[in-house]
């Protein structure tokens, strides 16, 4: 399982070389560190975690697992940032495409995440992976809630 996130991110970067991202192995290691037992990475990609197209030093790795969406960024000197978005906290996903790059906006109950400087060719792939997973998981949550009410 070690380095599986890095391999998926590297494959993404090879498919979509226009995406601006640095230090992918370090960021991927943070996600590997926080995976729960039995948790598997379904899809992973890299982007800048900001809304400024000129800020290209805030790379983050985003991993969709069979339980949640993880966003990790390793600091240069020490420490890191990790966000975990479970399907019950997920509200909406918005994609915008510019001349060169595109953005992915993830709206949750508690925060609004902006991922930028993503190759335009990757936007449909990212939207399909995240949306289809979250829709299926939300159905499961609703079903569990209905069973609890009965």
Residue ranges and their predicted role:
Residues 1-17, 21-24, 28-36, 54-57, ...:
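Acidic, Ser/Thr- and proline-rich intrinsically disordered linker/docking segments
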Residues 28, 45-49, 68, 75:
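Short glycine-rich, polar/acidic loop-and-turn segments at beta strand-coil junctions
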Residues 37-54:
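The phosphoinositide-binding surface of pleckstrin homology
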Residues 57-71:
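Polybasic phosphoinositide-binding surfaces of eukaryotic membrane-targeting domains
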